[in-house]
Curated annotation (Swiss-Prot):
GO terms for biological process: proteolysis. A motif (JAMM motif) lies at residues 175-188. InterPro entries: MPN (IPR037518), RadC_JAB (IPR025657), RuvA_2-like (IPR010994), UPF0758 (IPR001405), UPF0758_CS (IPR020891), UPF0758_N (IPR046778). This is UPF0758 protein GWCH70_2550. It comes from the Bacteria. Keywords: Hydrolase, Metal-binding, Metalloprotease, Protease, Zinc. The keyword NAD does not apply. Zn(2+) binds at H175, H177, D188. SUPFAM superfamilies: JAB1/MPN domain, RuvA domain 2-like. Belongs to the UPF0758 family. Pfam families: RadC (PF04002), UPF0758_N (PF20582). One of its GO terms (molecular function) is metallopeptidase activity. Residues 104-226 form the MPN domain. It comes from Geobacillus sp. (strain WCH70).
Length: 226
């Protein structure tokens, strides 16, 4: 017999709990169980969802898993994997829709909020430049490179070339630490100082360099490096 949601006690069923208390009240594995709908002959859908998350160490790695990696889990077939991937992609698109307008960045918190959900789960370091107009509105965003950050790779020319092309008044640079710890490294500080100096020469101010961790961030401006 395959375990289904209806086999779970009513007061513990994720769907009923969502209806009564809202989706924010559910744990990650409960939301996942609603997508999966059925378990296996050996375990309930809640147990299956919990095992799936444990395999991927939570949402961080599941977010970037391939259909082959997901279907390698016992009890997860193509249909279930497709449902999971579709839900993840919808989440990504909704996150992007939130900022399709001219988002205004007036503080490090504003900048971190703008990129946090896109960058906190990335498995590699991404260095991103955010270009602003004179009203501190975002006019463009560009990934400059992907990989370990060092001063020889992050060339100011690539950062400021786009700023000139977009007639940007200022820029904010952002990169993530896949470890989840946003503590700046010596390389982070060196890159920041180099970009800030180039910005002063060109006349396009580097407002900040943000390091994104897992729901945490560090502003190198607040640390006194910009």
């Amino acid at each position: 017999m395959t375990f289904m949601i209806r086999d779970v006690p009513k007061d513990a069923r994720p769907r009923e709990r969502l209806l009564s208390s809202g989706p924010e009240s559910l744990a990650d594995h409960e939301l996942l169980a609603i997508l999966l709908r059925t378990g296996t002959k050996e375990e309930s859908v809640l147990q299956l969802a919990h095992r799936l998350l444990k395999h991927f160490e939570g949402l961080r790695l599941l977010k970037d898993a391939t259909i082959e990696e997901i279907t390698s889990i016992k009890g997860i077939g193509t249909t279930k994997a497709v449902q999971i991937l579709a839900a993840i992609e919808l989440g990504r698109r909704i996150s992007r829709l939130s900022y399709n307008g001219r988002y205004v960045i007036r503080s490090p918190e504003d900048g971190a909020k703008y990129v946090m959900e896109d960058m906190r789960f990335l498995s590699q370091e991404h260095f991103v430049a955010i270009y602003l107009n004179t009203k501190n509105q975002v006019i463009h965003r560009k990934t400059i490179f992907i990989g370990s950050l060092n001063a020889s790779i992050v060339h100011p020319r690539e950062v400021f070339k786009e700023a000139i092309k977009r007639s940007a008044a200022s820029i904010i640079c952002v990169h993530n630490h896949p470890s989840g710890d946003p503590t700046p490294s010596r390389e982070d500080i060196d890159v920041t100082k180099r970009l800030a100096e180039c910005g002063r020469i060109i006349g396009i101010e580097l407002l900040d360099h943000l390091i994104i961790g897992d729901q945490k961030f560090v502003s190198l401006k607040e640390k006194g490096y910009v």
